[in-house]
UniProtKB/Swiss-Prot annotation:
The lineage of its organism: Bacteria, Pseudomonadati, Pseudomonadota, Betaproteobacteria, Nitrosomonadales. The gene is pyrD. This is Dihydroorotate dehydrogenase (quinone). Monomer. One of its GO terms (biological process) is 'de novo' UMP biosynthetic process. Binds 1 FMN per subunit. GO terms for molecular function: dihydroorotate dehydrogenase (quinone) activity. Catalyzes the conversion of dihydroorotate to orotate with quinone as electron acceptor. FMN binds at residues 61-65, 85, 138, 171, 216, 244, 267, 296, 317-318. Belongs to the dihydroorotate dehydrogenase family. Type 2 subfamily. The active site is at residue 174. It is found in: Cell membrane. Substrate binds at residues 65, 110-114, 171, 176, 245-246.
Amino acid sequence: MLYSLIRPALFSLDAEDAHGLTLTGLDVAQRLGLVGLQPRATGKPVQVMGIDFPNAVGLAAGLDKDGAHLKGLAALGFGFLEIGTVTPRPQPGNPKPRLFRLPAAEGIINRMGFNNLGVDNLVRNVVASGYTGVLGINIGKNKDTPNERAADDYLACLDKVYAHARYVTVNISSPNTQNLRELQQDEALDALLSAIKLRQSELAQQHGRYVPIALKIAPDLDEAQIAAIAALLMRHGIDAVIATNTTIARDAVAGLPNANESGGLSGAPVREASTRVVRTLAQHLGGALPIIGVGGILSGDDARAKIAAGASLVQLYSGLIYRGPGLVRECVERLAQ
């Protein structure tokens, strides 16, 4: 109710400025004890990747890139939080403006470009937060690292976040880092997954704790590509797959203001494509590993549809922009029914 009153003011601001203001406001409200005053929704606990989740509704990566807002976000009732994408070295991302709303379609286009303050800063924030819930950390490569050396960046991040994450997501599907999606192709993906699984095994022995690895993929894949990725995930023993990232397609928003901005489209317009990928993955994986469904969840029924398509967990991001924090409770309650 409250969000519906303040949303017009937020939408009158530049999208990225509104994003920052909202997170700052959430932090202040949490410190004042104003977040989470309502009783939390009674969620249905689930076990996925060997991890116990208090409920199946998580925050998708991208909202809190540096892990600087964990306490405020945790108070909203999520079953888990995923922060990042983080890279080995700080980088500013793409020039502004780089975040655009499409209110008529309940969509968002972003070309942020993995802007973040670097993995060392993220780790410091996580430690300082004292957050004890289920935390996923999403890792990527720096813009100026060629694809031939991409594994070096992912391994550098994995080394540093391993001790602080309950699971780690390898992001090879953002459309906003040039040529990144080429890492989804057979030979490149095979080599990357081999390197990551080897390092995961070494780190598990070093830390005495196994931290699952998830791979985040794009919605802009045909069935043959999805089948090939599924086969590689199973062959390498990857622990989960996140479907999906944003889309470069514009069919669902053609003719709308901002529709021609470059970048990845999220929100309601990606819902069907994302669910299609979840369903196709489920068919090819046959339960071999869990799917985390993300893309276009703006209601409890949308969350339920992702689960029905084959997902074990869901994540929210753009839906929070359009529906507010009450969406978390709605989804948690719907999935508990």
